[in-house]
Curated annotation (Swiss-Prot):
Localization: Cell membrane
InterPro entries per UniProt: ECF_substrate-spec-like, UPF0397
UniProt main location, coarse: membrane
Disulphide linkage map: none
Family: Belongs to the UPF0397 family.
Transmembrane segments: 9-29, 45-65, 72-92, 113-133, 146-166
Protein name: UPF0397 protein SSA_0592
């Protein structure tokens, strides 16, 4: 897909706004300050469609605004984690053929392996930063990290797969149009 700066700027703005709005829906987990987040499947979709820069900025800007609006302060390492998730998924966008109208079983498996790896890397950033900079207890942040990796991976696996499958179906497959 051709790089289109205006398109990417608009996608970043819309993506960050949706990240904030959807991020206001918090489904609590038993671990303090950790919840099931529904914005990451959408971030994965945007990362695959628009690439790593849009994916990073959507997560970074959206998470920063969400934290600022919540009144609990800005947790920069966790904000960075959101950006890194979008960046990593976006780096692998060329492995997917959603723009060609294809998101088949092998694509779904590949997507979910990539998003799980991206979640694992992204949600180690926050805890490491919390321990080193903020002096947070190691046991607490390890629990938060494990829960974040698992629940975010699960939501992206289910909802992200549905979103990418639906998006691929809106694209015209190459060679699918025939002259009558």
């Amino acid at each position: 897909m051709k790089n289109n700066t205006i398109r990417n700027v608009v996608a970043t703005g819309i993506g960050a706004a949706l990240f904030v709005v959807i991020g206001m829906i918090n489904i609590p987990t038993p671990v303090p300050n950790t919840s099931i987040q529904l914005q990451y499947p959408l971030q994965a979709l945007f990362s695959v469609i628009f690439g790593p820069i849009v994916g990073f900025l959507m997560g970074f800007i959206g998470h920063a605004i969400k934290d600022a609006m919540s009144g609990g302060g800005l947790w920069w390492f966790w904000i960075a984690g959101s950006g890194v998730f979008g960046l990593l998924v976006g780096f692998f966008r060329k492995f997917f053929r959603v723009e060609e109208g294809k998101f088949e079983v092998k694509d779904i498996i590949r997507f979910n392996l990539i998003q799980f790896g991206a979640n694992a890397i992204a949600w180690l950033i926050g805890p490491i930063g919390d321990v080193i900079v903020s002096g947070e207890p190691v046991n607490k942040v390890i629990a938060q990290s494990i829960v974040a990796i698992l629940v975010n991976s699960a939501t992206v696996a289910v909802i992200g797969t549905v979103l990418l499958t639906a998006y691929a179906r809106t694209r015209t497959r190459a060679g699918s149009l025939k002259k009558d």
